[in-house]
Structures are given as structure tokens and as C-alpha cells.
Amino acid sequence: IGVGLIPSGSEDPYGLRRNALGIIQIFLCWGWQVPLISLIEDGLRSMGSKLKLEPEAIKKHVLELFSQRYKSHLDAEGFPHDAIDCVLSTGLDSIVDIKAKVVAFSDLKKQPYFEPLAIAFRRVVSILKEGADGQVDPLLLHEPAEKKLFEVYLKLHEPVLQHIQKKEFDQALEK
């Protein structure tokens, strides 16, 4: 990709798609927690002056290639498309964590409380788009429901972050 050979349609003369899938499977098999972006950046540094595209453009193409391959891989394993898309939309930080998150999200979707939770989440996101910086000013909360929601947030914020740091994604989602 760095030298201008970007796979497209049926064109992939160097098997980059197959190689990307192989890398994904190796990471999953061995449980490697190496950030993909670090590997890409190391590769870019090693290529130096041989690059024909800007490093940021190369990173974008490589991440897109891995995202497409990983999406196909997870789809072949039978995970719901929306769960895959949801998790991949957060980025390709850790190949292993992505699969764990897709599993956790897929399990959450099976719960009877998921649909009302998803509706409430969409509403909150819609409201937050109108906000300035994403910070909550407790002095602006007047309605009892607003105050209660903020109390619940304060109560759950740290435990959820701790579960995420421990890679306990299912427990983070259950909170």
C-alpha cells in the first residue's frame, strides 16, 4: 500500500487481503494485545523514503483493509452485522479486544432489556449532540429525572472503566 499498490475489487496481486486476514488470525490465536496502529507506524518508519503516499493516507488504507478483513472474518463466524459494525466503528486498537467486544455486545443484544436501553442511548446521544463540550454541569440539572440519571452515571462510571481496563467487556456492558 505504501508504494501505491492498493487492492481494489478483484485486484490484489500481492495477496494483501489474505495477508491481513492471516495477521488477524495470528493475533487471535496467540492472544496478542499489540495495538495495530503501532505495527503500522513501525512499518511506515521502516519504509522511509520508499513510500509513494503520505503516511496518514497509508495508515487510513491499511486500517480500512484490516477493518474489511476483520468484518468478513467475524461475519463468517456468525456474529450479527450490527454488533460487528458497532464495535469496529470505535477503531482497530486491539484485534483480540475487538472480538471480545463483539461477543459481549452480541450477548447483550439477546437480553430483554436491550431494546429499551438502545432507545434511551440513542436519545441521550441525540441530546448530547446539542451540547458544547460533553461536560455535565450539575447546576444546570433541574428535573428530578436529570439529577437521578447523573447520580447513576457518577455511581457507575468508575466501575465500568475498571471492567474495561480488565478486559471484562461483558461486565462493563451489564453495568
Each PLM stretch: what is its role?
Residues I1-K175:
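Amphipathic alpha-helical "coupling" segments that flank catalytic cores
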